[in-house]
Curated annotation (Swiss-Prot):
E.C. number: 1.6.99.-
Positions where N6-acetyllysine occurs in the chain: 387, 592
Post-translation changes: Under normal conditions, a 54-residue N-terminal segment is first proteolytically removed during or just after translocation into the mitochondrial intermembrane space (IMS) by the mitochondrial processing peptidase (MPP) to form the inner-membrane-anchored mature form (AIFmit). During apoptosis, it is further proteolytically processed at amino-acid position 101 leading to the generation of the mature form, which is confined to the mitochondrial IMS in a soluble form (AIFsol). Ubiquitination by XIAP/BIRC4 does not lead to proteasomal degradation. Ubiquitination at Lys-254 by XIAP/BIRC4 blocks its ability to bind DNA and induce chromatin degradation, thereby inhibiting its ability to induce cell death.
Family under the similarity heading: Belongs to the FAD-dependent oxidoreductase family.
Residue(s) carrying N6-succinyllysine: 108
Entry's Gene Ontology molecular function annotations: DNA binding; electron-transferring-flavoprotein dehydrogenase activity; FAD binding; NAD(P)H oxidase H2O2-forming activity; NADH dehydrogenase activity; poly-ADP-D-ribose binding; protein dimerization activity
Full protein name: Apoptosis-inducing factor 1, mitochondrial
Originating organism: Mus musculus (Mouse)
Length: 612
Protein backbone atom coordinates (compact mmCIF):
# COMPACT_ATOMS: atom_id res chain seq x y z
CA UNK A 1 0.00 0.00 0.00
CA UNK A 2 2.77 2.42 0.98
CA UNK A 3 4.77 1.61 -2.17
CA UNK A 4 1.77 2.47 -4.25
CA UNK A 5 1.24 5.65 -2.28
CA UNK A 6 4.87 6.62 -2.69
CA UNK A 7 4.71 6.10 -6.46
CA UNK A 8 1.57 8.18 -6.72
CA UNK A 9 3.11 10.89 -4.57
CA UNK A 10 6.12 11.11 -6.84
CA UNK A 11 3.89 11.55 -9.87
CA UNK A 12 1.89 14.16 -8.00
CA UNK A 13 4.96 16.29 -7.30
CA UNK A 14 5.91 16.33 -11.01
CA UNK A 15 2.44 16.75 -12.44
CA UNK A 16 0.81 19.26 -10.08
CA UNK A 17 1.86 22.24 -12.25
CA UNK A 18 0.42 20.51 -15.34
CA UNK A 19 -2.96 19.35 -14.04
CA UNK A 20 -4.28 22.18 -11.91
CA UNK A 21 -7.43 22.34 -14.01
CA UNK A 22 -8.07 18.65 -13.55
CA UNK A 23 -8.88 18.57 -9.82
CA UNK A 24 -10.06 20.86 -7.04
CA UNK A 25 -8.92 21.02 -3.43
CA UNK A 26 -11.59 20.57 -0.77
CA UNK A 27 -11.53 21.61 2.90
CA UNK A 28 -9.59 19.35 5.21
CA UNK A 29 -11.53 16.37 6.49
CA UNK A 30 -10.96 14.27 9.52
CA UNK A 31 -11.30 10.98 7.70
CA UNK A 32 -8.53 11.45 5.13
CA UNK A 33 -7.24 8.69 2.94
CA UNK A 34 -4.55 6.50 4.50
CA UNK A 35 -1.03 7.77 4.12
CA UNK A 36 -2.22 11.42 3.91
CA UNK A 37 -0.85 11.59 0.32
CA UNK A 38 -3.65 12.90 -1.89
CA UNK A 39 -5.92 15.84 -2.17
CA UNK A 40 -9.47 14.72 -2.87
CA UNK A 41 -10.13 14.38 -6.63
CA UNK A 42 -13.26 14.70 -8.62
CA UNK A 43 -13.74 11.08 -9.53
CA UNK A 44 -16.31 9.02 -11.37
CA UNK A 45 -19.45 7.90 -9.57
CA UNK A 46 -18.15 4.35 -9.18
CA UNK A 47 -15.12 5.56 -7.24
CA UNK A 48 -17.23 7.86 -5.07
CA UNK A 49 -19.40 4.90 -4.07
CA UNK A 50 -16.35 2.82 -3.30
CA UNK A 51 -14.96 5.56 -1.05
CA UNK A 52 -18.26 5.90 0.82
CA UNK A 53 -18.33 2.17 1.43
CA UNK A 54 -14.79 2.26 2.77
CA UNK A 55 -15.52 5.06 5.28
CA UNK A 56 -18.84 3.63 6.54
CA UNK A 57 -17.24 0.92 8.64
CA UNK A 58 -18.39 -1.90 6.45
CA UNK A 59 -16.59 -5.19 6.59
CA UNK A 60 -13.19 -5.30 4.95
CA UNK A 61 -11.69 -2.33 6.75
CA UNK A 62 -8.07 -1.79 5.81
CA UNK A 63 -8.30 -4.05 2.76
CA UNK A 64 -11.09 -1.97 1.20
CA UNK A 65 -9.18 1.22 1.86
CA UNK A 66 -6.12 -0.31 0.21
CA UNK A 67 -8.11 -1.15 -2.90
CA UNK A 68 -9.44 2.37 -3.02
CA UNK A 69 -5.95 3.85 -2.76
CA UNK A 70 -4.77 1.59 -5.56
CA UNK A 71 -7.66 2.62 -7.81
CA UNK A 72 -7.22 6.31 -7.12
CA UNK A 73 -3.46 6.02 -7.59
CA UNK A 74 -3.83 4.40 -10.99
CA UNK A 75 -6.35 7.06 -11.97
CA UNK A 76 -3.87 9.74 -10.97
CA UNK A 77 -1.12 8.17 -13.04
CA UNK A 78 -3.40 7.85 -16.07
CA UNK A 79 -4.67 11.41 -15.84
CA UNK A 80 -1.16 12.75 -15.38
CA UNK A 81 0.20 10.79 -18.32
CA UNK A 82 -2.63 12.06 -20.53
CA UNK A 83 -1.98 15.66 -19.50
CA UNK A 84 1.75 15.25 -20.08
CA UNK A 85 1.18 13.74 -23.53
CA UNK A 86 -1.24 16.53 -24.50
CA UNK A 87 1.16 19.27 -23.43
CA UNK A 88 4.07 17.63 -25.29
CA UNK A 89 2.00 17.35 -28.48
CA UNK A 90 0.96 21.00 -28.21
CA UNK A 91 4.60 21.96 -27.78
CA UNK A 92 5.56 19.87 -30.82
CA UNK A 93 2.89 21.52 -32.97
CA UNK A 94 4.07 24.93 -31.81
CA UNK A 95 7.67 24.12 -32.69
CA UNK A 96 6.62 22.89 -36.13
CA UNK A 97 4.78 26.14 -36.77
CA UNK A 98 7.82 28.15 -35.75
CA UNK A 99 10.10 26.01 -37.92
CA UNK A 100 7.74 26.55 -40.86
CA UNK A 101 8.01 30.33 -40.76
CA UNK A 102 9.86 31.65 -43.80
CA UNK A 103 9.57 28.46 -45.83
CA UNK A 104 8.32 28.74 -49.40
CA UNK A 105 4.91 27.19 -50.18
CA UNK A 106 6.67 24.59 -52.32
CA UNK A 107 8.98 23.60 -49.46
CA UNK A 108 6.04 23.41 -47.04
CA UNK A 109 4.27 21.14 -49.51
CA UNK A 110 7.35 18.94 -49.88
CA UNK A 111 7.81 18.61 -46.10
CA UNK A 112 4.14 17.85 -45.61
CA UNK A 113 4.33 15.05 -48.17
CA UNK A 114 7.56 13.68 -46.69
CA UNK A 115 6.09 13.75 -43.18
CA UNK A 116 2.89 12.08 -44.30
CA UNK A 117 4.69 9.25 -46.03
CA UNK A 118 7.11 8.46 -43.17
CA UNK A 119 6.69 4.91 -42.02
CA UNK A 120 4.43 4.10 -44.94
CA UNK A 121 1.45 6.11 -43.62
CA UNK A 122 -0.21 8.15 -46.36
CA UNK A 123 -2.98 10.65 -45.54
CA UNK A 124 -6.29 9.37 -46.82
CA UNK A 125 -7.80 12.11 -48.96
CA UNK A 126 -11.18 11.07 -50.21
CA UNK A 127 -11.53 11.42 -53.98
CA UNK A 128 -14.77 12.90 -55.30
CA UNK A 129 -17.11 10.29 -56.73
CA UNK A 130 -17.75 12.34 -59.88
CA UNK A 131 -15.94 15.12 -61.76
CA UNK A 132 -16.74 16.81 -65.09
CA UNK A 133 -13.07 16.83 -66.19
CA UNK A 134 -10.66 14.08 -65.14
CA UNK A 135 -6.97 14.36 -66.06
CA UNK A 136 -4.87 11.22 -65.55
CA UNK A 137 -1.25 12.19 -64.94
CA UNK A 138 0.25 15.17 -63.15
CA UNK A 139 2.87 16.46 -65.58
CA UNK A 140 3.16 19.38 -67.98
CA UNK A 141 0.49 18.14 -70.42
CA UNK A 142 -2.10 17.70 -67.67
CA UNK A 143 -1.40 21.10 -66.17
CA UNK A 144 -1.58 22.78 -69.61
CA UNK A 145 -4.91 21.05 -70.23
CA UNK A 146 -6.28 22.14 -66.86
CA UNK A 147 -5.33 25.73 -67.52
CA UNK A 148 -6.86 25.56 -71.01
CA UNK A 149 -10.12 24.07 -69.71
CA UNK A 150 -10.43 26.76 -67.06
CA UNK A 151 -9.68 29.49 -69.60
CA UNK A 152 -12.57 28.39 -71.80
CA UNK A 153 -14.86 27.38 -68.94
CA UNK A 154 -14.07 29.52 -65.85
CA UNK A 155 -16.42 27.50 -63.66
CA UNK A 156 -15.00 24.12 -64.65
CA UNK A 157 -14.15 21.54 -61.99
CA UNK A 158 -10.94 19.75 -62.94
CA UNK A 159 -9.36 16.86 -61.06
CA UNK A 160 -5.77 15.78 -61.73
CA UNK A 161 -4.85 12.29 -60.51
CA UNK A 162 -1.07 11.94 -60.30
CA UNK A 163 1.10 9.00 -59.30
CA UNK A 164 3.87 11.50 -58.53
CA UNK A 165 3.94 12.74 -54.92
CA UNK A 166 4.71 16.25 -56.18
CA UNK A 167 2.41 18.94 -57.53
CA UNK A 168 2.77 19.62 -61.30
CA UNK A 169 6.23 20.91 -62.19
CA UNK A 170 8.43 21.48 -65.24
CA UNK A 171 11.16 18.93 -65.97
CA UNK A 172 13.74 20.85 -68.11
CA UNK A 173 15.46 22.56 -65.14
CA UNK A 174 16.17 19.14 -63.60
CA UNK A 175 18.90 18.62 -66.21
CA UNK A 176 19.76 22.28 -66.82
CA UNK A 177 19.50 25.28 -64.51
CA UNK A 178 19.24 23.50 -61.15
CA UNK A 179 22.71 22.02 -61.64
CA UNK A 180 24.27 25.46 -62.10
CA UNK A 181 22.75 26.89 -58.92
CA UNK A 182 25.05 28.23 -56.20
CA UNK A 183 22.39 27.65 -53.54
CA UNK A 184 23.44 24.75 -51.26
CA UNK A 185 19.75 24.15 -50.50
CA UNK A 186 18.67 23.88 -54.12
CA UNK A 187 17.51 20.28 -53.68
CA UNK A 188 15.10 21.47 -50.99
CA UNK A 189 13.88 24.75 -52.46
CA UNK A 190 13.90 23.64 -56.13
CA UNK A 191 14.39 27.30 -56.97
CA UNK A 192 16.79 28.09 -59.78
CA UNK A 193 18.40 31.22 -61.10
CA UNK A 194 17.90 31.71 -64.82
CA UNK A 195 20.72 32.93 -67.03
CA UNK A 196 19.22 36.44 -66.73
CA UNK A 197 19.52 36.29 -62.94
CA UNK A 198 15.83 35.92 -62.12
CA UNK A 199 14.77 33.35 -59.51
CA UNK A 200 12.11 30.83 -60.38
CA UNK A 201 10.54 27.66 -58.98
CA UNK A 202 10.14 24.51 -61.02
CA UNK A 203 6.53 24.22 -59.82
CA UNK A 204 3.97 25.69 -62.19
CA UNK A 205 1.90 27.03 -59.29
CA UNK A 206 2.17 27.08 -55.47
CA UNK A 207 -0.09 24.82 -53.39
CA UNK A 208 -2.45 27.74 -52.73
CA UNK A 209 -3.43 27.73 -56.42
CA UNK A 210 -5.16 24.36 -56.08
CA UNK A 211 -8.37 23.48 -54.28
CA UNK A 212 -8.99 20.44 -52.12
CA UNK A 213 -10.07 17.33 -54.00
CA UNK A 214 -12.69 16.64 -51.34
CA UNK A 215 -14.16 20.13 -51.70
CA UNK A 216 -14.00 20.27 -55.51
CA UNK A 217 -17.64 19.22 -56.16
CA UNK A 218 -18.98 21.91 -53.82
CA UNK A 219 -16.87 24.91 -54.84
CA UNK A 220 -19.11 27.47 -56.51
CA UNK A 221 -16.65 28.73 -59.13
CA UNK A 222 -14.88 25.43 -59.69
CA UNK A 223 -11.13 25.03 -59.66
CA UNK A 224 -8.26 22.59 -60.15
CA UNK A 225 -7.57 19.87 -57.58
CA UNK A 226 -4.68 17.40 -57.51
CA UNK A 227 -4.68 13.93 -55.98
CA UNK A 228 -0.98 13.13 -55.53
CA UNK A 229 0.39 9.65 -54.96
CA UNK A 230 -2.62 8.01 -56.61
CA UNK A 231 -2.60 5.83 -59.71
CA UNK A 232 -5.45 5.06 -62.08
CA UNK A 233 -5.34 1.29 -62.59
CA UNK A 234 -8.56 0.70 -64.53
CA UNK A 235 -10.38 2.67 -67.23
CA UNK A 236 -13.96 1.93 -68.24
CA UNK A 237 -14.50 3.97 -71.39
CA UNK A 238 -18.14 3.02 -71.91
CA UNK A 239 -19.02 3.56 -68.26
CA UNK A 240 -17.05 6.83 -67.98
CA UNK A 241 -15.35 5.51 -64.85
CA UNK A 242 -11.85 4.93 -63.49
CA UNK A 243 -10.63 2.93 -60.52
CA UNK A 244 -7.66 4.04 -58.41
CA UNK A 245 -5.04 1.90 -56.72
CA UNK A 246 -6.72 2.52 -53.36
CA UNK A 247 -9.96 0.97 -54.64
CA UNK A 248 -11.91 4.21 -54.99
CA UNK A 249 -13.88 4.93 -58.16
CA UNK A 250 -14.45 8.19 -60.01
CA UNK A 251 -16.92 8.82 -62.81
CA UNK A 252 -16.28 11.57 -65.34
CA UNK A 253 -17.74 13.36 -68.32
CA UNK A 254 -14.48 14.08 -70.18
CA UNK A 255 -11.12 12.40 -69.57
CA UNK A 256 -7.55 13.19 -70.60
CA UNK A 257 -4.79 10.58 -70.49
CA UNK A 258 -1.45 12.30 -69.92
CA UNK A 259 0.48 9.48 -68.28
CA UNK A 260 3.85 10.38 -69.80
CA UNK A 261 6.58 7.78 -69.93
CA UNK A 262 8.98 5.71 -67.86
CA UNK A 263 12.77 5.94 -68.43
CA UNK A 264 14.10 3.02 -70.42
CA UNK A 265 16.77 0.88 -68.87
CA UNK A 266 19.48 -1.17 -70.56
CA UNK A 267 19.16 -4.93 -70.89
CA UNK A 268 22.70 -5.27 -69.52
CA UNK A 269 21.64 -3.48 -66.33
CA UNK A 270 18.37 -5.42 -66.11
CA UNK A 271 20.40 -8.65 -66.15
CA UNK A 272 22.82 -7.40 -63.49
CA UNK A 273 22.55 -7.97 -59.77
CA UNK A 274 20.83 -5.92 -57.11
CA UNK A 275 23.94 -3.89 -56.27
CA UNK A 276 24.32 -2.67 -59.85
CA UNK A 277 20.67 -1.65 -59.98
CA UNK A 278 20.93 0.15 -56.64
CA UNK A 279 23.84 2.19 -58.03
CA UNK A 280 22.03 3.12 -61.24
CA UNK A 281 19.80 6.18 -61.70
CA UNK A 282 17.04 6.24 -64.32
CA UNK A 283 16.80 10.01 -64.47
CA UNK A 284 13.32 11.51 -64.77
CA UNK A 285 11.78 13.08 -61.64
CA UNK A 286 12.52 15.45 -58.78
CA UNK A 287 13.54 12.53 -56.59
CA UNK A 288 16.10 11.46 -59.20
CA UNK A 289 17.61 14.95 -59.27
CA UNK A 290 17.87 15.07 -55.49
CA UNK A 291 19.43 11.62 -55.33
CA UNK A 292 21.94 12.25 -58.13
CA UNK A 293 22.97 15.63 -56.73
CA UNK A 294 23.75 13.97 -53.40
CA UNK A 295 25.59 11.10 -55.10
CA UNK A 296 27.69 13.55 -57.13
CA UNK A 297 29.08 14.91 -53.83
CA UNK A 298 29.93 11.48 -52.44
CA UNK A 299 31.49 9.43 -55.25
CA UNK A 300 34.61 9.83 -57.36
CA UNK A 301 33.20 8.79 -60.75
CA UNK A 302 29.83 8.95 -62.55
CA UNK A 303 29.11 7.48 -65.98
CA UNK A 304 26.24 8.80 -68.09
CA UNK A 305 24.96 6.32 -70.68
CA UNK A 306 23.17 8.05 -73.55
CA UNK A 307 24.18 10.69 -76.08
CA UNK A 308 20.85 12.42 -76.69
CA UNK A 309 19.40 15.58 -75.18
CA UNK A 310 19.11 14.44 -71.58
CA UNK A 311 22.36 12.47 -71.51
CA UNK A 312 24.39 15.31 -73.02
CA UNK A 313 22.82 17.94 -70.77
CA UNK A 314 23.48 15.90 -67.63
CA UNK A 315 27.03 15.12 -68.74
CA UNK A 316 27.75 18.82 -69.29
CA UNK A 317 26.16 19.78 -65.98
CA UNK A 318 28.16 17.18 -64.06
CA UNK A 319 31.28 18.00 -66.06
CA UNK A 320 31.13 21.66 -65.18
CA UNK A 321 30.57 20.72 -61.55
CA UNK A 322 33.62 18.44 -61.69
CA UNK A 323 35.88 21.41 -62.32
CA UNK A 324 35.42 22.32 -58.66
CA UNK A 325 34.78 18.91 -57.09
CA UNK A 326 37.26 16.80 -59.06
CA UNK A 327 34.71 14.08 -59.81
CA UNK A 328 35.32 12.04 -62.97
CA UNK A 329 32.46 12.31 -65.49
CA UNK A 330 32.23 9.78 -68.32
CA UNK A 331 29.67 9.76 -71.12
CA UNK A 332 29.29 6.81 -73.47
CA UNK A 333 26.85 6.10 -76.29
CA UNK A 334 26.64 3.99 -79.47
CA UNK A 335 26.51 6.92 -81.94
CA UNK A 336 29.57 8.58 -83.48
CA UNK A 337 29.00 11.86 -81.67
CA UNK A 338 26.77 13.70 -79.24
CA UNK A 339 23.14 13.89 -80.37
CA UNK A 340 24.10 11.80 -83.38
CA UNK A 341 20.46 10.85 -84.03
CA UNK A 342 19.52 14.51 -84.36
CA UNK A 343 22.42 16.52 -85.76
CA UNK A 344 24.27 15.98 -89.03
CA UNK A 345 27.59 14.22 -88.50
CA UNK A 346 29.85 17.27 -88.83
CA UNK A 347 27.84 19.17 -86.22
CA UNK A 348 27.57 16.13 -83.95
CA UNK A 349 31.36 15.79 -83.96
CA UNK A 350 31.80 19.49 -83.21
CA UNK A 351 29.31 19.23 -80.35
CA UNK A 352 31.21 16.28 -78.91
CA UNK A 353 34.38 18.37 -78.73
CA UNK A 354 32.41 21.08 -76.97
CA UNK A 355 31.16 18.56 -74.38
CA UNK A 356 34.73 17.39 -73.79
CA UNK A 357 35.75 20.96 -73.00
CA UNK A 358 33.12 20.96 -70.25
CA UNK A 359 35.19 18.35 -68.41
CA UNK A 360 33.53 15.18 -69.72
CA UNK A 361 35.37 12.07 -70.93
CA UNK A 362 33.28 11.20 -74.00
CA UNK A 363 33.33 7.67 -75.39
CA UNK A 364 31.45 7.35 -78.72
CA UNK A 365 30.77 4.08 -80.55
CA UNK A 366 30.26 2.41 -77.16
CA UNK A 367 27.72 -0.42 -76.82
CA UNK A 368 27.28 -1.78 -73.30
CA UNK A 369 27.56 -5.57 -73.16
CA UNK A 370 27.48 -6.21 -69.40
CA UNK A 371 27.68 -4.45 -66.04
CA UNK A 372 29.03 -6.00 -62.86
CA UNK A 373 30.85 -5.23 -59.62
CA UNK A 374 34.61 -5.57 -59.21
CA UNK A 375 36.62 -4.43 -56.22
CA UNK A 376 33.77 -2.34 -54.89
CA UNK A 377 33.34 -0.47 -58.17
CA UNK A 378 31.01 -0.92 -61.12
CA UNK A 379 32.63 -2.51 -64.15
CA UNK A 380 31.08 -1.74 -67.55
CA UNK A 381 32.21 -4.03 -70.36
CA UNK A 382 31.70 -2.74 -73.88
CA UNK A 383 31.06 -4.81 -76.96
CA UNK A 384 34.43 -3.88 -78.51
CA UNK A 385 36.32 -5.12 -75.43
CA UNK A 386 36.84 -1.81 -73.68
CA UNK A 387 36.15 -1.61 -69.94
CA UNK A 388 34.98 1.31 -67.84
CA UNK A 389 35.25 1.47 -64.05
CA UNK A 390 32.92 3.86 -62.27
CA UNK A 391 31.03 4.38 -58.99
CA UNK A 392 27.58 5.24 -60.30
CA UNK A 393 25.64 4.99 -63.56
CA UNK A 394 23.01 7.33 -64.99
CA UNK A 395 20.97 6.02 -67.91
CA UNK A 396 19.37 8.49 -70.31
CA UNK A 397 18.28 6.36 -73.25
CA UNK A 398 14.73 7.53 -73.88
CA UNK A 399 11.24 6.86 -72.57
CA UNK A 400 8.77 4.03 -72.74
CA UNK A 401 5.26 5.54 -72.95
CA UNK A 402 2.95 4.54 -70.11
CA UNK A 403 0.09 2.78 -71.90
CA UNK A 404 -1.15 0.30 -69.28
CA UNK A 405 -4.66 1.78 -69.45
CA UNK A 406 -4.99 0.71 -73.08
CA UNK A 407 -5.82 -2.84 -72.02
CA UNK A 408 -8.72 -2.08 -69.68
CA UNK A 409 -9.88 0.85 -71.80
CA UNK A 410 -9.75 -0.99 -75.11
CA UNK A 411 -7.58 1.75 -76.65
CA UNK A 412 -5.25 1.30 -79.63
CA UNK A 413 -1.46 1.35 -79.31
CA UNK A 414 0.59 2.45 -82.30
CA UNK A 415 2.84 -0.40 -83.40
CA UNK A 416 5.49 1.87 -84.96
CA UNK A 417 5.91 4.76 -82.55
CA UNK A 418 4.29 3.43 -79.38
CA UNK A 419 1.82 5.43 -77.34
CA UNK A 420 -1.96 5.74 -77.54
CA UNK A 421 -3.05 6.18 -81.13
CA UNK A 422 -5.21 9.32 -81.49
CA UNK A 423 -6.55 11.45 -84.34
CA UNK A 424 -5.57 15.00 -85.27
CA UNK A 425 -7.85 16.31 -82.49
CA UNK A 426 -5.97 14.09 -79.99
CA UNK A 427 -9.05 11.91 -79.45
CA UNK A 428 -8.83 8.21 -78.68
CA UNK A 429 -12.60 7.96 -78.13
CA UNK A 430 -15.44 10.48 -78.18
CA UNK A 431 -14.89 11.24 -74.48
CA UNK A 432 -11.18 10.35 -74.17
CA UNK A 433 -8.21 12.50 -75.21
CA UNK A 434 -4.46 11.85 -74.96
CA UNK A 435 -1.63 14.42 -74.75
CA UNK A 436 2.09 14.60 -74.06
CA UNK A 437 4.67 11.82 -74.31
CA UNK A 438 2.03 9.06 -74.41
CA UNK A 439 0.15 10.42 -77.45
CA UNK A 440 0.83 9.10 -80.94
CA UNK A 441 -1.01 11.73 -82.95
CA UNK A 442 -1.62 12.58 -86.58
CA UNK A 443 0.18 15.75 -87.67
CA UNK A 444 -1.69 17.16 -90.69
CA UNK A 445 1.62 18.40 -92.15
CA UNK A 446 4.18 15.77 -91.12
CA UNK A 447 2.11 12.62 -90.62
CA UNK A 448 1.88 10.36 -87.60
CA UNK A 449 4.27 11.21 -84.77
CA UNK A 450 5.05 10.80 -81.09
CA UNK A 451 7.08 13.55 -79.42
CA UNK A 452 8.85 13.58 -76.03
CA UNK A 453 9.52 17.24 -75.30
CA UNK A 454 8.35 19.89 -72.86
CA UNK A 455 6.86 22.24 -75.45
CA UNK A 456 4.94 19.41 -77.11
CA UNK A 457 3.44 18.59 -73.72
CA UNK A 458 2.37 22.24 -73.40
CA UNK A 459 0.96 22.47 -76.94
CA UNK A 460 -0.79 19.09 -76.96
CA UNK A 461 -2.13 19.54 -73.43
CA UNK A 462 -3.52 22.94 -74.30
CA UNK A 463 -5.12 21.63 -77.50
CA UNK A 464 -6.65 18.67 -75.68
CA UNK A 465 -8.10 21.03 -73.07
CA UNK A 466 -9.62 23.20 -75.77
CA UNK A 467 -11.14 20.20 -77.52
CA UNK A 468 -12.48 18.83 -74.24
CA UNK A 469 -14.50 22.05 -74.03
CA UNK A 470 -15.80 21.82 -77.60
CA UNK A 471 -13.17 23.50 -79.80
CA UNK A 472 -12.74 20.55 -82.23
CA UNK A 473 -9.36 21.88 -83.45
CA UNK A 474 -6.72 19.73 -85.21
CA UNK A 475 -3.06 19.60 -84.23
CA UNK A 476 -1.40 22.10 -86.53
CA UNK A 477 0.76 24.27 -84.24
CA UNK A 478 4.28 22.85 -84.47
CA UNK A 479 5.88 22.47 -81.07
CA UNK A 480 9.56 23.22 -80.59
CA UNK A 481 12.26 21.85 -78.35
CA UNK A 482 15.56 23.15 -77.13
CA UNK A 483 18.75 21.93 -75.53
CA UNK A 484 21.50 23.84 -73.74
CA UNK A 485 24.99 22.47 -73.25
CA UNK A 486 25.82 24.96 -70.55
CA UNK A 487 25.39 28.72 -70.87
CA UNK A 488 27.43 29.04 -74.08
CA UNK A 489 25.95 26.56 -76.58
CA UNK A 490 22.30 25.89 -77.23
CA UNK A 491 19.89 25.16 -80.01
CA UNK A 492 16.20 25.20 -80.76
CA UNK A 493 14.48 22.82 -83.17
CA UNK A 494 11.11 22.21 -84.73
CA UNK A 495 9.50 19.56 -86.93
CA UNK A 496 11.08 16.28 -88.02
CA UNK A 497 14.70 16.55 -86.94
CA UNK A 498 16.40 13.29 -87.86
CA UNK A 499 20.04 12.91 -88.92
CA UNK A 500 19.01 10.21 -91.41
CA UNK A 501 17.27 12.90 -93.51
CA UNK A 502 19.16 15.05 -96.05
CA UNK A 503 20.27 18.33 -94.48
CA UNK A 504 21.53 21.71 -95.60
CA UNK A 505 23.33 23.88 -93.05
CA UNK A 506 24.19 27.55 -93.31
CA UNK A 507 26.46 29.06 -90.65
CA UNK A 508 27.99 32.37 -89.64
CA UNK A 509 30.45 33.62 -87.06
CA UNK A 510 28.90 33.92 -83.60
CA UNK A 511 28.97 37.08 -81.52
CA UNK A 512 29.04 37.48 -77.75
CA UNK A 513 25.23 37.66 -77.79
CA UNK A 514 24.71 34.32 -79.56
CA UNK A 515 24.29 31.98 -76.60
CA UNK A 516 21.53 30.67 -74.30
CA UNK A 517 22.37 33.19 -71.59
CA UNK A 518 21.70 36.15 -73.86
CA UNK A 519 18.56 34.51 -75.22
CA UNK A 520 17.21 34.17 -71.68
CA UNK A 521 18.03 37.79 -70.91
CA UNK A 522 16.09 38.90 -73.99
CA UNK A 523 13.06 36.66 -73.46
CA UNK A 524 12.94 36.91 -69.67
CA UNK A 525 12.60 33.15 -69.18
CA UNK A 526 14.85 30.11 -69.30
CA UNK A 527 11.94 28.01 -70.56
CA UNK A 528 12.34 29.42 -74.03
CA UNK A 529 9.26 27.72 -75.43
CA UNK A 530 7.18 30.04 -73.22
CA UNK A 531 8.28 33.05 -75.24
CA UNK A 532 8.30 31.30 -78.61
CA UNK A 533 5.21 29.07 -78.56
CA UNK A 534 2.66 31.87 -78.77
CA UNK A 535 4.45 33.73 -81.56
CA UNK A 536 3.49 33.33 -85.18
CA UNK A 537 5.02 34.68 -88.37
CA UNK A 538 2.14 35.79 -90.57
CA UNK A 539 4.13 36.37 -93.72
CA UNK A 540 7.51 35.34 -95.08
CA UNK A 541 9.38 37.62 -97.46
CA UNK A 542 13.06 37.49 -98.34
CA UNK A 543 14.54 40.98 -97.84
CA UNK A 544 16.30 42.08 -101.06
CA UNK A 545 19.04 43.91 -99.18
CA UNK A 546 20.05 40.94 -97.06
CA UNK A 547 23.77 40.14 -97.16
CA UNK A 548 24.98 37.23 -99.22
CA UNK A 549 25.07 33.88 -97.45
CA UNK A 550 28.37 31.97 -97.59
CA UNK A 551 28.71 28.34 -98.56
CA UNK A 552 28.13 25.59 -96.01
CA UNK A 553 31.21 25.22 -93.75
CA UNK A 554 33.37 22.15 -94.11
CA UNK A 555 34.38 19.69 -91.40
CA UNK A 556 36.50 21.25 -88.70
CA UNK A 557 35.23 24.81 -88.95
CA UNK A 558 33.73 26.65 -86.00
CA UNK A 559 29.94 26.46 -86.13
CA UNK A 560 29.25 29.56 -84.10
CA UNK A 561 25.63 30.00 -85.20
CA UNK A 562 23.51 28.84 -88.09
CA UNK A 563 20.43 27.15 -89.50
CA UNK A 564 20.11 23.48 -90.47
CA UNK A 565 17.26 22.47 -92.79
CA UNK A 566 15.99 18.87 -92.83
CA UNK A 567 14.40 17.77 -96.11
CA UNK A 568 11.93 15.13 -97.20
CA UNK A 569 11.07 15.04 -100.91
CA UNK A 570 12.80 18.44 -101.23
CA UNK A 571 10.38 19.97 -98.72
CA UNK A 572 11.66 21.41 -95.42
CA UNK A 573 10.18 19.26 -92.64
CA UNK A 574 12.54 20.20 -89.80
CA UNK A 575 14.78 23.09 -88.76
CA UNK A 576 17.51 23.44 -86.13
CA UNK A 577 18.49 26.96 -85.05
CA UNK A 578 22.04 26.65 -83.73
CA UNK A 579 22.77 29.47 -81.29
CA UNK A 580 20.08 31.45 -83.12
CA UNK A 581 17.28 32.53 -80.80
CA UNK A 582 13.91 34.27 -81.00
CA UNK A 583 13.40 33.19 -84.62
CA UNK A 584 11.16 30.18 -84.05
CA UNK A 585 8.01 31.79 -85.58
CA UNK A 586 9.82 31.99 -88.92
CA UNK A 587 10.86 28.33 -88.76
CA UNK A 588 7.32 27.33 -87.80
CA UNK A 589 5.89 29.22 -90.79
CA UNK A 590 8.32 27.58 -93.23
CA UNK A 591 7.27 24.10 -92.11
CA UNK A 592 3.59 25.02 -92.10
CA UNK A 593 3.78 26.25 -95.70
CA UNK A 594 5.37 22.96 -96.81
CA UNK A 595 6.84 24.35 -100.02
CA UNK A 596 9.87 23.34 -102.06
CA UNK A 597 12.70 25.86 -102.11
CA UNK A 598 15.19 26.09 -104.94
CA UNK A 599 17.84 27.84 -102.86
CA UNK A 600 17.92 27.31 -99.12
CA UNK A 601 20.67 29.92 -98.84
CA UNK A 602 17.99 32.47 -99.65
CA UNK A 603 15.66 30.97 -97.07
CA UNK A 604 18.44 31.21 -94.48
CA UNK A 605 18.47 34.99 -94.94
CA UNK A 606 15.12 35.11 -93.16
CA UNK A 607 16.84 34.28 -89.88
CA UNK A 608 19.26 37.24 -90.03
CA UNK A 609 22.16 35.12 -88.86
CA UNK A 610 24.68 37.69 -90.13
CA UNK A 611 23.38 40.54 -88.01
CA UNK A 612 25.84 41.65 -85.31
Amino acid sequence: MFRCGGLAGAFKQKLVPLVRTVYVQRPKQRNRLPGNLFQQWRVPLELQMARQMASSGSSGGKMDNSVLVLIVGLSTIGAGAYAYKTIKEDQKRYNERVMGLGLSPEEKQRRAIASATEGGSVPQIRAPSHVPFLLIGGGTAAFAAARSIRARDPGARVLIVSEDPELPYMRPPLSKELWFSDDPNVTKTLQFRQWNGKERSIYFQPPSFYVSAQDLPNIENGGVAVLTGKKVVHLDVRGNMVKLNDGSQITFEKCLIATGGTPRSLSAIDRAGAEVKSRTTLFRKIGDFRALEKISREVKSITVIGGGFLGSELACALGRKSQASGIEVIQLFPEKGNMGKILPQYLSNWTMEKVKREGVKVMPNAIVQSVGVSGGRLLIKLKDGRKVETDHIVTAVGLEPNVELAKTGGLEIDSDFGGFRVNAELQARSNIWVAGDAACFYDIKLGRRRVEHHDHAVVSGRLAGENMTGAAKPYWHQSMFWSDLGPDVGYEAIGLVDSSLPTVGVFAKATAQDNPKSATEQSGTGIRSESETESEASEITIPPSAPAVPQVPVEGEDYGKGVIFYLRDKVVVGIVLWNVFNRMPIARKIIKDGEQHEDLNEVAKLFNIHED
